[in-house]
Regions:
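N-terminal hydrophobic or amphipathic helices and topogenic motifs
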Residues: 1-4, 8-11, 15-19, 184, ...
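Beta-alpha-beta core module
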Residues: 52-59, 63-64, 78-79, 85, ...
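Conserved functional loop/turn residues at catalytic and ligand-binding sites
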Residues: 5, 21, 35, 39-40, ...
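Central regulatory/effector-binding core of bacterial HTH transcription factors
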Residues: 1-53, 114, 121-122
Length: 208
């Protein structure tokens, strides 16, 4: 989330509220939960999951997934991608424990893909995108990342067929968090930093 949301949100927030000193760290979801429960962080921006019910969650926006396919991939020739289309192509996937990866693997039924399918595990969406651009396989990218792409890169983007897998991005706080005005400010400013079209889940999207 951070590489694509922070450039849209942080500069304007810092300009409007220079007195607020935000300390930002990137963590996996399991580490976020521990840090919130221990009071080590005040809030977290994560993809909503059923296992986060012990926290307060404010919806920030809904972000759909896209396929990023190299010109040599059979996916590149499709106008939209069905989940069944993904089971015979090499995919670049984040390691287990990243909610971005885990939600898509579940939605697309990739765990049932043939054992002979080549899949690659590294740690960065940006790295995967460079590999796709070099002609190798396909990967998944979040909607906010598409606003940073060049025209050449946009030609590698393919939408999912309906229902489009979409993640709900939320602001998490502990149940005993008392700084209500700060929480509300963060929610409002983050929502203002993303396109209005992402504020609601559409009928063509499916929250995963």
């Amino acid at each position: 989330i951070a590489p694509y949301l922070l450039p849209r949100f942080l500069p304007e927030f810092s300009r409007k509220y220079p007195q607020i000193d935000l300390q930002i760290s990137e963590m996996k979801t399991a580490d976020v939960k521990r840090a919130l429960l221990k009071g080590e962080i005040d809030a977290a921006i994560v993809a909503q999951l059923s296992e986060l019910e012990e926290f307060n969650a404010d919806t920030l926006f809904f972000e759909q997934y896209f396929v990023y396919a190299s010109p040599s991939s059979e996916l590149h020739d499709r106008d939209s991608i069905r989940t069944a289309d993904l089971r015979e192509v090499p995919l670049w996937l984040l390691d287990e424990g990243h909610c971005f990866r885990d939600q898509l693997v579940s939605f697309c039924h990739l765990k049932s893909a043939r054992r002979s399918q080549r899949s690659y595990h590294l740690g960065s969406i940006e790295t995967f995108m460079r590999m796709v651009e070099s002609g190798l396989g396909a990967t998944f990218i979040p909607e906010l990342s598409t606003f940073q792409l060049s025209e050449e890169q946009k030609r590698l983007v393919r939408p999912f067929a309906v229902p489009v897998p979409t993640r709900e991005i939320v602001l998490l706080t502990a149940q005993d968090f008392v700084r209500e005005s700060m929480r509300r400010l963060l929610v409002d400013e983050i929502r203002a930093a993303v396109p209005p079209s992402m504020h609601r889940l559409t009928h063509a999207q499916k929250s995963i």
